[in-house]
Structure formats: structure tokens, C-alpha cells
Amino acid sequence: ALYKALLQDDSLREDARGYVQKYMLEKVAAEKHASTVKMEAVPGFYRIYSSVFLKIMRTSDLWESEQRSGKDCFDVTIKRCLWHTACAENGCPELCRLFCDADNVTYGGLRKIGFSRTKTLGYGADCCDFHFFRK
């Protein structure tokens, strides 16, 4: 809604994506990262985090995904994504990339969990291929 409002204002239209990007990365993702860093102090964090993440992906109808897990890693391949669907349905598919970029900030640089991804729906791929591993 904010993005669409910014697009309606001639003086803000050109910078609308930049404003939303700055907010998503410097506020939303940075706060999610900071809270995850705090949670890392909990003993057994990796086991708890992986269990909760996988349960959410298995039980939520907001995503369509496949999950694989091992002792020290877990993978989630997302074929349908809440953010990708919402952005497309609201006429701003270009915003989905900001959610993908926010994941990089949220999960990047953690001490106990590593994160990688080679493709995302938001950047035009057929899926998002999340890979998390114990550090």
C-alpha cells in the first residue's frame, strides 16, 4: 500500500522503490537479523530453529514447498510464496525482490546458522532454494 501510494505522487514516483527498499533492508530485515542473533544465545538454537522453520513450512498454506533435513542442514524448496503471490496480485511484482533481499540480510552473518540460496521466485526463477546449515 505504501509503495502504491508513493507511485501516485509525481514527486516521489521515481524514488518509490528506493524508499521501500531502504525500509525493508535497513529496518525490517535488520531487526529480524538482530532478533535472530539474540535467539542464537539459546542452547540448542539450531535444533529449535530448524524444527520450527520446517514445521511452519509443512503446515502453512501460505507457501507450497518441499523440505529435506539432516543432522546439520535443512533445505526448503519453495514453489509458491506468500510474498511472490501477494506482490503479483497487487500489481507490483517488482517488490517481491525486496523480500528476497531481506532474507539475505536476515540470515546473513549469523554465528550458528549458515544460509545460501541460488535462485528465487522474486528474481524470476522457478523456485526459491533455501539451504540452511549448522556452523
Residue ranges and their predicted role:
Residues Q8-D10, G108-G114, K135:
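Secondary-structure boundary elements
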Residues A1-N90:
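Amphipathic interaction/junction segments at domain boundaries or subunit interfaces
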Residues M57, Y123-G124:
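A short catalytic or substrate-binding loop motif that flags glycine-/basic-rich loops and adjacent residues
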